[in-house]
Amino acid sequence: MKIVLISGLSGSGKSVALRQMEDSGYFCVDNLPLEMLPALVSYHIERADETELAVSVDVRSGIDIGQAREQIASLRGLGHRVEVLFVEAEESVLVRRFSETRRGHPLSNQDMTLLESLKKEREWLFPLKEIAYCIDTSKMNAQQLRHAVRQWLKVERTGLLVILESFGFKYGVPNNADFMFDMRSLPNPYYDPELRPYTGMDKPVWDYLDGQPLVQEMVDDIERFVTHWLPRLEDESRSYVTVAIGCTGGQHRLVYIVEKLARRLKGRYELLIRHRQAQNLSDR
């Protein structure tokens, strides 16, 4: 049976993610105490219900991170496929969302300010984030978050999932990257008026960057680095690794390099591609 645990920071979109799981055909339970998870799984099996499970867990249920990791290991040992989805957002974004909704943080009744509550929650949940697939919703609306969840669900993962993500530095760096590479020193098609309207997915940009020795050297170096270290991370039982490729605007060089790396890594690892700033390009 496939079981998805959804966790993350309050205000980051866990409820939206859970609703998308329900729309995708999962049997969903919100705010389940972790000690009840084995009983829920057993009940589901006894009913011969083949519907996949999605369970939201957070600080309201008094989540014990050590217990959570033990539960995951135990369920996997029984042959269940257990995935963890973690949603988060930047602190300033969470503060704004709480202000707009006028809702209190779940920890706010413990004599802490909102900022202190957010910091405590982030520290508390960090060990769970380490084994999860992370979605940063800072610059997402509900529809975009739903799309990100759907794209993640499409990946039939049997081993390490490698997320190749392009981003523009001027929009902020992704906070969930395991490796980050800066492409701003490479030749930039943006300064060619004929290439500026295109993205790194288009043939004119590919032809231009294919002919740049420095660009090809960079792709080779990143491929060597990634393929050297990924097996070691896999040995540590990591489920997800995010490789972030950044440049100034996020439209040309890095999109090309992410796509180039994906072609080279395809067949060796499960891949998920994200282009954060190239809005016309779908994650896949």
From Swiss-Prot:
- Asked if Nucleotide-binding is a keyword of the record, the answer is yes
Residues in a coiled coil are: none
Q: What are the protein's UniProt keywords?
A: ATP-binding, GTP-binding, Nucleotide-binding
Q: Where is the signal peptide?
A: none
Binding annotation for GTP: D58, V59, R60, S61
Quote the InterPro entries the UniProt record gives: P-loop_NTPase, RapZ-like, RapZ-like_N, RapZ_C
Quote the Pfam families the UniProt record gives: PapZ_C, RapZ-like_N
GO MF annotations in UniProt? ATP binding; GTP binding
**What's the superkingdom here?**
Bacteria
Q: Where does ATP bind?
A: G8, L9, S10, G11, S12, G13, K14, S15
Give a short account of what the protein does: Displays ATPase and GTPase activities.
Q: Quote the NCBIfam families the UniProt record gives.
A: PRK05416.1
Write out the similarity annotation. Answer: Belongs to the RapZ-like family.
Q: What is this protein called?
A: Nucleotide-binding protein NMA0948
Q: Which species is this UniProt entry from?
A: Neisseria meningitidis serogroup A / serotype 4A (strain DSM 15465 / Z2491)
